[in-house]
């Protein structure tokens, strides 16, 4: 019998708890080839970390009075890769959009110009949101890694298609600091786009857990 709790056992226990106690849907995105697009995320490019179908489905439900074309416009703004921005600046910009909504303009059926905001997350009634726990998602580098490098975080928690929580797990006999030094630090370097929407980073080996921001 193993004298430690394996990373995989921790991951599976976490996913089961999220699903059965907290009401998350669970999606295993692992593919044998990192570049394979058929992973259930509906991304057209593995550099993207936002799930477009989840986001649009949520936005249509949360914004019934806004034309679909304007919702598409808002989603395009959210999904902009912000390659020229630092992760901190991109995170600040997306935080504002998630908190306040994405401003749009349109003419209503009477021809009157409307100024509204596309709501991305329902903060008053969390049950209106789409909760998804994603495991083993391949993400292609846009950072300073070698060309076509891929990274695969253990678990990412999505709300309405937005990756808000990053979770890195280790065997219980591995120092938790290794999750920071070996994984989180390299993700900052290789796939900084993962942290543009990030609200929390969680590092755990089941015996010890740390929660903080990506900075």
What is the predicted role of each segment?
Residues 1-215:
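An alpha-helical interface "stripe"
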């Amino acid at each position: 019998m193993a004298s430690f709790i394996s990373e995989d056992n921790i991951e599976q226990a976490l996913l089961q708890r999220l699903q059965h106690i907290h009401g998350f849907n669970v999606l295993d995105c692992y593919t044998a080839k990192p570049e394979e697009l058929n992973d259930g995320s509906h991304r057209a490019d593995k550099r993207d970390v936002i799930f477009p179908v989840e986001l649009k489905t949520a936005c249509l439900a949360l914004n019934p009075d806004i034309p679909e074309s304007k919702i598409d416009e808002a989603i395009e703004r959210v999904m902009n890769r912000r390659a020229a921005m630092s992760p901190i600046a991109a995170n600040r910009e997306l935080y504002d959009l998630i908190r306040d909504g994405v401003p749009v303009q349109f003419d209503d059926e009477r021809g009157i110009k409307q100024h509204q905001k596309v709501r991305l997350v329902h903060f008053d009634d969390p049950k209106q949101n789409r909760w998804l726990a994603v495991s083993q998602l391949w993400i292609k580098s846009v950072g300073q890694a070698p060309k076509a490098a891929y990274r695969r975080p253990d678990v990412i928690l999505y709300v309405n298609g937005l990756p808000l929580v990053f979770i890195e797990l280790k065997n219980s006999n591995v120092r938790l600091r290794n999750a920071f030094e070996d994984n989180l630090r390299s993700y900052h370097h290789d796939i900084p786009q993962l942290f543009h929407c990030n609200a929390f980073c969680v590092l755990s080996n089941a015996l010890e857990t740390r929660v903080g921001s990506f900075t």
